[in-house]
Amino acid sequence: MYIIAGLGNPGKEYMGTRHNAGFSVIDELADKYNISVDTAKHKGLIGKGVIAGQKVILVKPMTYMNNSGECIREVMDYYKCDIDDFLVIFDDISLDVGKLRLRAKGSAGGHNGIKSIIAHLGSDKFKRIKFGVGDKPKNWDLADWVLGKFPAEEYATLREANKKACEAVECILTDGIESGMNKYNG
């Protein structure tokens, strides 16, 4: 069984924000594979289903970004999931809008949600898909940038990136992270 988490913040006011890119990919996967991510459990919303022949649990932590690790730890413990079978999708300001970067492991890179997951799991050796949201303009506050909504002219790019992220998840599940990195890291 694979646990696939997308990071974001709960609440309508955060829908469509850069920080909720992970939630958007989970929603896209849920739609594509008819998985209802609506069971409130383990400080998150979860849904069970099958993607690319693998049993999966899709997770949207409801702890707010900076405490995402609380939810992930509870889900991992409850389902007795090994860290090798965990994948997280999250926003990355160091990548252009819609660009993806897959990694097998790594530091938090300044991302508080990932920092929380590393702290709660006691390891940084988990797979991840970084979803590019673009760097903040000069003189902008970082929080204002990541909590801001994407402009309408980026919607088409985001739709394509969501589809590409779903394909990357499928690739990881069927062929492994190395294959995914070779195919999707541009």
UniProtKB/Swiss-Prot annotation:
UniProt keyword list: Cytoplasm, Hydrolase, RNA-binding, tRNA-binding
GO biological process, one term: protein quality control for misfolded or incompletely synthesized proteins
Catalytic-site annotation from UniProt: 19 (proton acceptor)
GO cellular component: cytoplasm
Residues the UniProt record annotates as site (Discriminates between blocked and unblocked aminoacyl-tRNA): 9
Key word Hydrolase present: yes
EC number(s) stated in the UniProt entry for this protein: 3.1.1.29
Catalysed reaction, written as an equation: an N-acyl-L-alpha-aminoacyl-tRNA + H2O = an N-acyl-L-amino acid + a tRNA + H(+)
Localization (cell): Cytoplasm
Gene Ontology MF terms: peptidyl-tRNA hydrolase activity; tRNA binding
Sites where the protein binds tRNA: 14, 64, 66, 112
Site (Stabilizes the basic form of H active site to accept a proton): 91
Function: Hydrolyzes ribosome-free peptidyl-tRNAs (with 1 or more amino acids incorporated), which drop off the ribosome during protein synthesis, or as a result of ribosome stalling. Catalyzes the release of premature peptidyl moieties from peptidyl-tRNA molecules trapped in stalled 50S ribosomal subunits, and thus maintains levels of free tRNAs and 50S ribosomes.
Protein family: Belongs to the PTH family.
Subunit structure of this chain's protein: Monomer.
Name this polypeptide is given: Peptidyl-tRNA hydrolase
Phylogenetic placement of the source organism: Bacteria, Bacillati, Bacillota, Clostridia, Lachnospirales
